[in-house]
Structures are given as C-alpha cells and as structure tokens.
C-alpha cells in the first residue's frame, strides 16, 4: 500500500518515516521508554486549554454536564432524557461518523473540504481566510503531538485525520458516558432476588465489563491509533492487515466481543430497558461495520489479483490455433477445455437470490415448505400432533446426519455416488449436481421440520413480567441470530464448492485456506453452527425441544468426527491446522498444568474415536446390505429501473449571464452517422454501446465554477428549462475543486479555456431565449471571448442500456438548464446470421464462432471500460477479475449479449467463461439449441417456414 487513498501522495517524508518505524517494531515490544520521554517533553511544554495529562477540557466539560444533569433531573425524567441523549450520541457515531467515513473513502470529502476552506494554509501567505481557526487547530494538534510533528510541514491528509480524531474522541466519550448514566438511571434490584443471585449477577456483569476492557486495550495495542481512528480512510501505509492478540480470537473483536461490557452493565443494572438499548446499539454498530468499514476494507486490502495475460509465442502457434477452430464434427461439439478441473459455479443453490423455480430442486423445496406451513398452521397443538411433529423432526435430523453421513462416507472410500452415475453413462459433473440437490433438499427439510416442531411446542407466556420470560426470549433470539450469522459466514468462506463437500467428489480440491470465520475456529458448526436449536429450546422451554436440540448437537458432532475429519485427514494430511486462532490464544494464557491436562483429554478422545471407527468398520458390511440411494432430478431476472425522484434545485436569479454564450456539443469523431427518414433531411448520431463520449461546452467568462453537465435519457425530463430527475452519478463538473467529491471531476479534460466566439446583435439574457442546441445566431456581429472546456463520459457515467440521450448543462450546482446537446443514440448492433458463409454445415460452428468472436470483442472491451488492466485485447485473453459483490462488468456483457444475439445468460456464466472465445462458443451452441424456436431463419437445418423473407 504505497499510495494514498484517493488523494495525491504527500512529498513530506516525516509521516512515512514515522509509520515505517512503527511497522518495524515487534507487535509486543514495550514502549514505556518512548512514552516516558514523550511525557517528559510534554511536561516541559506549556499547555493552554488542556489538562496536564493531555485530555481535552472541552470533552471533560461536556461529560461533566452529563453527570450534573443526572442529579439535577427529577427521577421520572432521567430515563427518557438519557435514553434520548444516548441514542443521539449513538446516531452521531454510527450515522454521522459513518457518513463522513463513507464519503471520505469514496470521494475524499474531508480532505477536499480542508483544501477548499484552506484551513491548513499558513496565514502568512495571505491565502487563509480563517487565521484564528488556523492558530487554534495548530495549537491543539501540536499540544496533542509534542514531538516528531510539524503542523506546517505535515501532509494535508494527516492534518485532516488529526482533526477528525478530535471529533471522534468527543463523540465516543459522550456516547459511552451517556450509556453508563442511562444504566445508572435504570438500575434497580428485583424484589424477589435472593443474595446469591445478586452476587452472581454482579460477578458475571463485572467479568463481562473487565473482559470488554481487555478486548479494547489489546485491540488498541495491536492496531495503534492509525487503525483505531480509521487512518486508512485518509492515507495508506506499507502494512497489511494485522491478526494478532484479540484479533485472532474473534472476527471484528471491537464490534463483536468488544460489546460484551454492554451486556455486563445491563446485567448489573437488572433492567430490560438497558438490555434492549444495548442490543439496539450493538445492532447499529454491526450496521456501521457492514455498510462503512467492510466495503472500505474490501476495496483497500482485498483488491482482486491482476489477471493472467496470454502471450502468443510465435505466429506458427497462432496459425495452429486458428486452424483448430475449423469446423469438424469431432471438435465443435466439445467445449473448450477448462484449465481447472473443478466444477464451475454458475447456477448456485444456496440463498434466496439463487432461487430458480425452473429447477426441480427449488420448486420441490417451495412446495414442501408450503405443505409444512399448511400442516403446522391448520392442525391443532394437541399432544398427539405435538408428538408427530417432534417425531418428524427427529427422523429428518437422523437422515440429515446419519443418512447424508453414510453417503459421504461411501463416496470418500469407494466413490459410490459418482460410480452410480458413471454406470449409466453420465459424468461426474452430473453426479455432483444431483448430490447438491439431494443435500440441499435434506438440509431444508431438516430445519423446516425442526421449526414446525418448535412452533407446535411453543406457547405464549401468560405474564411477560413474571420470571425470566423476556430474558429467555431475548437469549433465544440471540442464539438463533448467532447460528444464522455463522452459517452465512461459513458459506462466504467455503463457497458453493465447500458448502456441499466438493472435495468428496473432486480429487483436484483447492488448497486449504483459513479465511473468514475459519481464521478463528476450525469447526464453527460444532458449537456456533447449532446455537439456534438451543435458542429454540430455550424459548419454548419444552423437554421435547431440549431432546431435539441434544440429538441435533450430538449427531452434528458425530458427523464431524466420523465423516468429515477422517476424509480431511486422508485428503490434506499434514496440511490440516491443529489449532485455530481462538484455541491458540487460550492455550497461550493457560498455565503449564492445564496444558498437560488438555493433552491427556485429547488422547482419551482420540482413542475413543478410533475404537468407534473400528466398530463401525466391522459392522459396515451388514449395515450396507439392502441400503439403496435416493435419486431426484434436479431465473428469473428482474431488471430494476431507477426511480424518478424529483430533486430539483433552482437558481432564482440568472441575471448577468448571456444565455447565447452557453452551448454544449457532442464530439462526433467516434460516432456513426445514420440518415433518418426517407428524404435524408436529418442525421441521427449513434454511439456504440459503452464507448466513451466526449463533450465540448462553452459558457460566459463569469459563469459559476459550480456548473456541471449531466447525461439523461430523452423523455425523462418534461421541462427544457429545469431538470427534475436525478442523474444517478452520471455527471461531470466543469471546474476542478468545486464539489465535495473526486468522482465529480472524473472525466474532466479541460476547463475555462478562453476562446473567441462570434457575437449576436440581439443578445438576450433571459433564460427563455437560450439556444438548447448551442447553435449560433444567424445575425452576427463582433466576436467576443467565452470560456470553453471538454469532458468525457465513460464507465459508470454512461447509461449501460440502449436508447436516445442528451447532455444538459446546469448552472451553479443547481438544476437550471442553460444548454442542451443534440440528441444521440446508443445502440447495440444486431448480429446478422446472414453474414456467415452459406456453406457452413449445420453441425459445424467454426466460421460462426469466429464471426461471433469478431463481433463480440469490441463490445466486451467497451463493457470493461477499455481499461488495459481488465479489458481483453484478444478473444483468448481472459477478462479482469472483479469481486463477488460488484458484478457490473458481467452485467454489462450479459445485457449486450442479450441485445446482440437474443440470448440471455446469467452473470455467473460470463464470469465462468472468462474470455471472449469461450463466451462465443457458448453463444454459438445456444443459438443452435434455440434455432427451432427462433423468429429468424438459420443457416443450419431447421423446420421450413414457407415464407419468402425474414420476419422482422
């Protein structure tokens, strides 16, 4: 990470050297000496407006006001007032700071604010309009960092981050203080609580608070102030993500286990109000993590790797490659060989987004779920029905663990599942697809039957305030949420291949990678993955549900020990990790005697497992007799159009601007001109799908520096005077540094270039007299000077769809339209089968594939923004990589293929094909399959239509 994020690299070396020293130091190196020297220097330095230990008096004063307010308010107002106070500070944290960080990550907004306001410019230069603010900030920051820091010489990114830290300190301190005061206001002792429960409640609560404190301190020890205050949102250092200490124990410890203290305080306060507001605050923090931090981490530290480029060694090899694509009956029916022998995941099963009712597995699951729901809702909750629902759940759990485990065990030792399909002439890919359907159906029915049984056994409490009814429901819901989160994390780490035990079916298994939740736990499904069944048992308080939970947990552990673990040891051997991050952290903290005890327990468990395996191996032939396998045969895409949101902002006074000086014209050097109409009186400008569009504009010399140009579809805006529909990011500023977003300047080539323009004798300054097309008046007089500029719209600033569009020039950051460009069209050319030589046989696709490649390559290059890093230069060169969450390039290609060839693919198909050659082969075969249903004639054999011309 040798560059700054979204801002230019500072020339100052002090920042880099200071961080480089910190990086070179060991993580656990003591720093007391350095801190002591800094403290001594700070003691000698005169401090104004700060306490002797360096804490801001303003922050302490606001905290003190909170405490005073607690004692001044009457008792009946304390709880609501401090609830509002805490929620306000929490909103300032999660919404306020979250918005600032989001804008800084994507647009460098805070750094742009600092540049625009010039608050860090030395007043001696005469360019700083706020000299007093400059002096105040300088005094504050130099007091905060007494050594190794120069306010004048530090990069603007670093100074901006330091000011941001002061705001964060205020919000975080007030957030925690208001929460503690709210807990004090709500604190009480239950009337029926005995002394033993009181002691237990306080001991556990204090333990959670101390654990929370240790997590925060250890996290700060590892990440230091740079990551603690989100420094990488402002600038980057040559350092990767750190996983040490508490970061080895749990994912995002400051947001997960780092909130244990909130629940400890709730326990000590013995208040459900504190508990519920703690859950709300914790949920808001997770939303902050998901919406702000995770996207920035993915963008900064987990960028996709550079693509592999194909280099042709010599012309002879290229000639052989071309000749190999000639039509032949033996080669054309076989797809290009995949460089990886693993199955391509193009039609996933797991998740609502992958639901496909055309697939028999999904439709069967939906029908069975409806049946379960109907039976559960329409039958009474009598003991006999409860018994049958619990029995049904137990049977499905046995099948899910024992039956599926038996199939996987046979597949691991003798490949029985794959052999069955090979026996009937099918491939191992077909066996894999059928297995995925069987496992997915079994898992769904197992949990559906469990939920139905829990519903039958559940009864609403008659009195929610009696006993622990509320607490049991809260804890139960928390355990269910924990299992859902664990399952999602496992799927994100393993993918479709690992979720369905792909290494049981394919020998070419990928190398083990311990990422995601597996960084901390070897088998998260052993405990966390079954937390939800215990949550249901806790909510229902039913002995039958406790039995089901115990059965589920026992069978789950047995499945891991008897099926998964032996196969993993056989497949990966010494590549398996012995201890996960959490276990390593716990072992490091254990005394030697406990470590010896742990080793003895491990040996006993290993010997017991070996004994059970020997018994099962002996009984397997008898158990296998008469056992048969069950076989089952195995999208809708929604195109979302942007909402028409009115966001009109109008400048009331346009006096002083010559409307005839405003013009906007589309550069026609890259467009295709087509005659429109029989008399050829007009021309239609047509641009290729995805090609960059250059725009030239002119404006008066006194035009606003906040003018901007937007791209709109014709018909979106009913008015030619005012734009009332959002551009959805498809706009470019006319001048640098005018808006709080670096994206607004993306595409800006030149601005405010003074040029000469012929004048008009009847110059009008009324908005209604403007020329929307930017054409000059016929009555010409002496020329005058105007400002001009050029910009290019490309990538995300284009409409990735066909249609007729226009550019609009807007005034002063508002939506007054000063000029409108000539309409132009974005079009995808239809692929004409008539271009293929007529001698191509019906069973040979060589020329067809080549023609499709030639037609498709420039479109695909446009879809990848013509970026040399990701855009293919040849049909054989692979596409660039993109993350799972951002499929914009694949979506563009899917739309282009659909419009060009009339064939609709999923985005996963484009990603799996990987290059234009494979995609062209797939299109060619899809056209052959769909030829009998096509509305156009085909060069191949098809049913005669009896018509003399093609249907349009």
From Swiss-Prot:
GO terms for cellular component: endoplasmic reticulum membrane. It is an enzyme of class 2 (transferase). It comes from the Eukaryota. The keyword Iron-sulfur does not apply. Residues 319-329 have a biased composition (Basic and acidic residues). GO terms for molecular function: phosphatidylethanolamine N-methyltransferase activity. This is Phosphatidylethanolamine N-methyltransferase. It comes from Arthroderma benhamiae (strain ATCC MYA-4681 / CBS 112371).
